[in-house]
């Protein structure tokens, strides 16, 4: 049986911590194949080029998606997310993942989730239903609504996902993976 291809998009050092252990488990499985896609701040020198940390941890990215158009304005962010979605569409078309695994609530992860959803790639979301109290919280809830499998970190978060109308059989209270 061919291994199932699990794409993981990682965009920043903070969320990398959430998926690192899971990525090691995917790599150890004979039934799964890791397809690591690196984007966002990982690729920027001004944020420490944290892609180097990923490589030092033993991972080989299947793809890198440069996305930033420059600037930190709302317009620049919106344009950058559009660039990311175009790049991810090409990568997903090439890799043909069976599932996209994402974590957190950053805009880059929302763009990845939207792209996968429109390409009929099922999405699993680590940290569904958490609260942050800022714009990223809205992104997290949008990611949750687009995801097919929900992996909240606690029962309160799982309850929020259920209250959003998600089917209970799709919700797995797994705790925080880091």
Predicted regions and their residues:
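PLP-dependent amino-acid enzyme catalytic core
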Residues: 2-3, 27-29, 60-63, 75-95, ...
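Conserved nucleotide-sugar phosphate-binding/catalytic loop shared by glycosyltransferases and other
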Residues: 33-77, 87
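An aromatic- and histidine-rich active-site surface loop
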Residues: 101-118
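N-terminal subdomain of nucleotide-sugar transferases
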Residues: 1-42
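Short N-terminal targeting/anchoring amphipathic segment
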Residues: 90-106
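Structural motif
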Residues: 9, 37, 102-104, 126
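Active-site-proximal region of nucleotide-activated glycan assembly enzymes
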Residues: 121-178
């Amino acid at each position: 049986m061919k291994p199932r291809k699990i794409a993981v998009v990682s965009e920043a050092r903070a969320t990398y911590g959430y998926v690192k252990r899971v990525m090691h488990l995917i790599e150890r499985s004979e039934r799964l194949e890791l397809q690591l896609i690196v984007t966002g701040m990982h690729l920027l020198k001004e944020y420490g080029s944290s892609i180097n940390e990923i490589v030092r941890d033993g991972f080989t990215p299947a793809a890198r998606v440069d996305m930033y158009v420059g600037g930190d304005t709302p317009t620049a962010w919106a344009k950058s997310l559009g660039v990311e979605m175009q790049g991810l569409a090409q990568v997903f078309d090439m890799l043909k993942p069976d599932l996209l695994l994402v974590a957190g609530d950053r805009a880059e992860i929302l763009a990845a989730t939207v792209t996968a959803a429109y390409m009929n790639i099922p999405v699993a979301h680590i940290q569904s239903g958490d609260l942050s109290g800022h714009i990223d919280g809205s992104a997290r809830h949008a990611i949750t609504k687009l995801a097919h499998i929900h992996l909240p970190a606690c029962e309160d978060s799982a309850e929020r996902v259920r209250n959003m109308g998600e089917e209970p059989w799709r919700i797995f209270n797994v705790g925080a993976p880091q």
